[in-house]
Amino acid sequence: RADEVDPVSGEMTPKRDLILKELDNAEKILDHNESYKVIHIDTGVSKKYDSHITFSAGLNGWQPLGTAALAGEKVVVYVGAPGRRTGDNTNLDLYATQYHSEASHLQKKVTSLKVGFNEITVPAVSSLGVEKGGALYIEYTGNNPNEIYAVRVIGGSQYPVLDVTRAETAEERKELTDAYVAEMAEYVQKIEEMHNENSDSEDSHSAISGLDYDERNCILGATDIVLDQMMFSIPIKQVYKSIAGNGESQDEAAEKLYQSLMAMDEMIHLFYQHKGLNAAPVTGGKTYEKDKLPTTRLNIRYQRMFAGAFMYAGGLHIGIEWDSCALL
């Protein structure tokens, strides 16, 4: 149809290039449909909603894409938005991070995404002599919870993510945790194999990184666990060790993680209540917006320590080291 000639004007449609581009986009998505999942961005999470929070500078609005990429890798981020055209601006920023980074070299904004295909080359965030790269995140920068965005990442390496923020019941939350633990149990066994796979190819992980496998610095070891008020960005092997390191069955490990995350949620809500913050601050029929809980989150991250430190509080995160991650 894009090549049909109008019988009146004798010309092709003026939108021919756009139509062909959209067809090409659709074909690429279909080609990768089985291996690249769709992430629905939560537009209820934004710094724009948290202007009343005096400590908002220490909160993080990132949403994980479940993709880790090395510096220099080409990645395509496809953004869909109902009612928008290809090339339209969005309220989505893409961030690249350095896995196990120093406090001052954690992240770099890559671009503000547009509707449709966004092809990017992952930048180097750090100059450390380890694998350069890390997890990719999106931050919603708008203030309209009715906006809808769906994102698909083509390229990089996918890793397991647990996000329980949209679970409406305890049963649904438990099911998500069970599925995550099952995926994690399989994933942790093959991280080194993934690093070394197709090592003779210039496009392989080991070739691009130029380094041998290092358990503590391989970006494939990432995972994110997203709660209402907290996001853990820590090594997946340490998560697994903490719940299954004593011979626990998969069901026991899942229950252990479920209870641990519930305890963290309850503790943070207690802290926020102590500060006078509440999910629905209503008194005498009046809603007090300044007393609402923040939408953005605390972020505990696997980071490189400076001399004498076992943890630190940075601008967008709380940094802890390898051994501490297994204690969470």
Tell me the role of every PLM-derived stretch.
Residues Y36, Y49, Y78, Y95, ...:
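Sequence-level detector for tyrosine residue identity
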Residues D3-E175:
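Beta-strand-enriched, solvent-exposed domains that form extended recognition/catalytic surfaces
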